[in-house]
Amino acid sequence: MMSSSSSEIDVVKTRIPTYDEDDDTILYAYETKPDFVNKEPNTVSDASCNTEEQQKTVNDVLIHCQVIYDAMQNLDKKIDVIRRKVSKIQRFRARSLWTNRKRYGYKNYSYQLAKKLKRQKMKKNEVHESFSYPESYSPTLPVSRRENNSPSNLPRPSFRMEEYQRAEPEEDPILSRTPSPVHPSDFSEHNYQPYYASDGAMHGSSSGPCLGNPGANSIYNTYSTDHASAAQPSVTSSPFENDRYIEEGSITKHPSTWSVEAVVLFLKQTDPLALCPLVDLFRSHEIDGKALLLLTSDVLLKHLGVKLGTAVKLCYYIDRLKQGKCFEN
């Protein structure tokens, strides 16, 4: 008999003949088809293959998940390290701000110290100015005092242009032919000699101006027509032995009409220590009175190459000339 689970399609039905003619019983033989027998194992093998592939896929997914988890763990560790470093930097900055912070009253202390130094500097300047005459032209170069027992302890003439204008006699033809007098300078180590002028050549140094007697009101007060024919005594050499004669009328009332040599003499007698090195420079550039009044600190520094301190002093003296403190307006 055929089992209930098997179908007629998978079974081969065969009739079995009987030898009894009187018996109506019919016998059948059932056999399984060979194709069905061979087909069933293939189905089982395909199912097992699918199961293995599924397990392999699951394993791959789990492996990738593990890799991702490990990467996240490493990233968390790196983030923790970065946070610790940032917090350390912040603590260091906060500590440096608190340690370098100025204490209370520091500003007031520095202000008092600066004020004290300023007072000391003002006292030094007052002491320094007490050693110089009020007629001193230079604010930085003190004028040495003469001794009380000096024979030439007389009032010193200052650098005033009106004295030279007042000293020029207009009616005397003899004096009109003599060179113009120069500015008297303050030299305590040189003795002043009497000065006489005539038509002939001047005795003494031929390259420098002669200095008059400072005891008189002017150089020409000691001169009279009675002394024109008198013998001319010898005169000591001037402190500026290398200077040339200043031409007549070169030093006039206003500095804008000065010649180059008058400007050079002005530099030497104003501040010899600071301005004497500029003599050759002024002569080479032929700087006269007009050019002197037009000089500025920028021109002196950039174009003439003068040092800063010397340029400041010279600009100060030029401002004094412009204000009319050394000549009459």
From Swiss-Prot:
What are the start and end residues of every segment in region (Disordered)? 125-194
UniProt key word Phosphoprotein:
yes
Tell me the compartments it is located in. Nucleus
The answer to whether UniProt assigns keyword rRNA processing to this entry is no
Gene3D superfamilies per the record? Transcription Factor, Ets-1
Q: What is its main location?
A: nucleus
Role according to the record: Putative Polycomb group (PcG) protein. PcG proteins act by forming multiprotein complexes, which are required to maintain the transcriptionally repressive state of homeotic genes throughout development. May be involved in spermatogenesis during sexual maturation.
Family, per entry: Belongs to the SCM family.
- The protein's name: Sex comb on midleg-like protein 1
Source species, please?
Macaca mulatta (Rhesus macaque)
